[in-house]
Amino acid sequence: MELELLFQNVVNSFAFYNNQVAVAVSGGVDSIVLLHLMTNWAKKNKLSLPTALTVNHGLRPESQKEADFVVSYAKELGAKESFILNWEKQNIKGNIQLQARKARYKLLAEWCKNNNVKYLLVAHHKDDQAETFLLRLERGSGVDGLSSMDYKSFLNGIYIFRPLLNFSRSEIEKYAKLHRLKWIEDRSNYDLKYRRTLYRNLLKASDNQEILTERICLTALHMKRAAKALMHYTRLAFNDCVNVHDLGYIEIKLSEFYQLPEEIALRLLLYSIMAIASKHYKPRYNSLIVIFNKILQKDSNVNCTLSGCKIRKHGENILIIRESSKIQEITLNLPLNEPTQWDNRFSCTILGNQECSVIIAPLKKTQKVPEFLKDYNCCPEVFYSLPVVLKDGKVLAYPDVNYNGKNTNDDKVQCIINSTIKQNLVSLISI
């Protein structure tokens, strides 16, 4: 069948080789077809069979039953293994679908990372692309929001592939019926309280759904090309305007910032905030533009917070600093054999042979900045977002930035930190 041949060409271009691959399977026709195609491709090429992952959001009475179906049917289709990932939701407010989507990707990416799986396949198709475009158009999205999805993207260290992007829902359903596959019909797909359902029905009601969907996807592709051009110039601006400091903050040089076209300057501010907050999702435009406009007023006193970051004017620069109150403490058992990630900004290597439980917390918790840190000529608030090692409320080790001598209260423990913010930036602006 043509769909299968085209799919094989797409997947061959991804160059998985013999790396382990996971497939996100909701139980709907598109993800079942994706798993069927992928297992057949793996068998044909004598490669490792894919693992099926399904997320139980627990939002409907039948959620567990559907997850159990996926596990059972994935085995029948030839998956290597299958797992149910449960969403431990708390106090859901606002847009449930958006929160469920964020949780789903978080659970999938975490499982892949914990199991050394680098590649995750998802079943987005051409109709999803068109519906998403219309949804975002209604919300007033800009170039990025209206851009087409990529065949390949990068999230939290995992490559996400979308091999069905060029196929329509009708082509996928035709394939499923031809191969007598079983799938679940999600009732929420027909619920008119969701805007996506409205746009799905709108496309179906058009005189020629196939042509309209194709043209919407073409417009989204034009937007993607424009977004890539803007990102190219944003990367150049980062080289000229931005300093990423070892102490875990970003400094934007205003003299250079004011010379940039507004769209590039806005993106530079946006991605600086996202890199410090280590968030994949962008802050609300309405909140961001208020801060941006304040920065453009050259005599204004900029002192704002957004996405867990402090945005401060300091001399002739804008500083993006992590809000210490938003940082999660972590508990570890010493000794450690490898570095640990802290706040997604630092890789912490803790040296010492003590066998004990310690907490890595923001320095602000100690209410004391050690003298050696004061030698760094920077805004004092920067220090409060640095990690310290605590035991029973007492400091065992302050952060050693350059690893050039003792800086601890206890000679047996030392905390060497390396900033990972540049890596955060690279993953954000390397489309």
Curated annotation (Swiss-Prot):
<comment type="function">
    <text>Ligates lysine onto the cytidine present at position 34 of the AUA codon-specific tRNA(Ile) that contains the anticodon CAU, in an ATP-dependent manner. Cytidine is converted to lysidine, thus changing the amino acid specificity of the tRNA from methionine to isoleucine.</text>
</comment>
<dbReference type="GO" id="GO:0032267">
    <property type="term" value="F:tRNA(Ile)-lysidine synthase activity"/>
</dbReference>
<keyword id="KW-0963">Cytoplasm</keyword>
<comment type="similarity">
    <text>Belongs to the tRNA(Ile)-lysidine synthase family.</text>
</comment>
<dbReference type="GO" id="GO:0005737">
    <property type="term" value="C:cytoplasm"/>
</dbReference>
<keyword id="KW-0819">tRNA processing</keyword>
<dbReference type="GO" id="GO:0006400">
    <property type="term" value="P:tRNA modification"/>
</dbReference>
<keyword id="KW-0547">Nucleotide-binding</keyword>
<dbReference type="InterPro" id="IPR012795">
    <property type="entry name" value="tRNA_Ile_lys_synt_N"/>
</dbReference>
<keyword id="KW-0067">ATP-binding</keyword>
<protein>
    <recommendedName>
        <fullName>tRNA(Ile)-lysidine synthase</fullName>
        <ecNumber>6.3.4.19</ecNumber>
    </recommendedName>
</protein>
<feature type="binding site">
    <location>
        <begin position="26"/>
        <end position="31"/>
    </location>
    <ligand>
        <name>ATP</name>
    </ligand>
</feature>
<dbReference type="InterPro" id="IPR014729">
    <property type="entry name" value="Rossmann-like_a/b/a_fold"/>
</dbReference>
<dbReference type="GO" id="GO:0005524">
    <property type="term" value="F:ATP binding"/>
</dbReference>
<dbReference type="InterPro" id="IPR011063">
    <property type="entry name" value="TilS/TtcA_N"/>
</dbReference>
<dbReference type="InterPro" id="IPR012094">
    <property type="entry name" value="tRNA_Ile_lys_synt"/>
</dbReference>
<keyword id="KW-0436">Ligase</keyword>
<dbReference type="Pfam" id="PF01171">
    <property type="entry name" value="ATP_bind_3"/>
</dbReference>
